[in-house]
């Protein structure tokens, strides 16, 4: 088993690769290209730049979570074919750059929904949380 840590990238994570490298036993990160729109092809150049950044910190990219899947694929609308082709190209590009593990989800519209991003636990730690009542109160038209 490999010990990894989720890393949101240098633009989006307050935890640096240098800090992750200091955690005993952690050898890699699970990451993604957060500034890439769903359905956009990940070029080999962008993938390689991400890998290089991680490797320069003494870690490696253990996997991707995730390549965002365009809602056209998830909902089955006609324009999905182009996005399926783009997704396949991205997976091929990841493989060519040595990344062989990709986590994915096919949840349409809301994707991974959380209603709270920092619920405080009794010990002072924070966790993600989901409350169905908050979702029920949403107005999708707004």
How would you label these PLM feature ranges?
Residues 1-142:
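N-terminal pre-domain/capping segments
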